[in-house]
Amino acid sequence: MRNEERNVEGSINSSALQIGLSDFEILVLDDQSTDRTFHLADSLAKSVKTNTIKVFSGGKLPEGWLGKNFALHSLSKQATGDYLVFLDADVRINESAISVAIQVLEEHEWSYISPYPKQIGIGFLANLVQPLLQWSWFSTLVLRRAEKSLRPSTAVANGQFFIVKAVDYRICGGHEAIKDQVLDDLELARLMRKSKFKGSVVDGSKVAQCQMYTNSSELIAGYEKSQWRAFGNTLGAIIVSALLFISSIYPILILPFHFEIGLIFYLLIFFSRMLCAVRTDSIKWTAPLHPVAIALWIYLIFRSIYRKNLKSLYWRGRQI
């Protein structure tokens, strides 16, 4: 955790209430926070009679590492369990979330599983943009086929809630092998597949929820942090943005000239967004504004690329 004082109590408490597990430990690393993160986490750990919760202070970030990757790598070295559960501080899980996820993992004979939490949006911008990631998965990937594949290009993951078999994680190299990758969740899933380990994203909306941002400024900063890398390189971003424009914005632009064609394509994209929202219990009321959301997403992609090229991207006080 880095400067997560508002999330410390909720994160640790929801994790500590897990049932259906024979044994578990909660490891918290304070990544050189400048707020009360360590104090709050340490106080919670000391208030528990058992040694379930352990709090560590992170050291200086080594050269070549990104902060989150080094923190997770450090925690993985301290962990003693058969499974590693990586959980963002802003995620809240219900009491059976981990046991249910592990059961699904075992039933499919996977090495990792990534339950996608229900996204809680605060404000218009978050409700407009946040559902796009889930929609992009469901509209461009056949997840049932992707989860059976070992092709790294079909891997999808969400680092908010990620469970992996500890032995397989270490065999593939773990976060040390992706120490400088800003999209650590996706790169870890690709790394697992390169090592012939299967896994997938699953709908986690019934067992977990996440409020990533509290205002529009945080959302913009969060998207800026990673979108420059989301599609491989600038050419990939241009190609994806062009496809998004053609499929989601162009139908609206041609309505005055080719009303029926434009309306048909708009309704198709609208229904795909609604179908995803219903399936994942995500935000529905912004679905009619999908073209606006896509326009904003394209803007954020190229804003991220621009700022990365200027070397002016920062996250939690560290340059990316």
What is each residue range found by the language model?
Residues 13-23:
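Short, acidic, metal-binding catalytic loop of nucleotide-sugar glycosyltransferases
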Residues 30-40, 60:
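A conserved acidic beta->alpha catalytic loop
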Residues 36, 89-104:
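Acidic donor-binding/catalytic loop of UDP-sugar-dependent glycosyltransferases
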Residues 55-74, 100-163, 167-171, 286-297, ...:
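Long helical/loop segments within the catalytic core of UDP-sugar-dependent glycosyltransferases
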Residues 80-83:
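Short acidic donor-binding loop at the edge of a beta-strand
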Residues 105-108, 112-137, 167-170, 175-237:
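Catalytic donor/gating beta->alpha subdomain of glycosyltransferases that bind UDP-sugars
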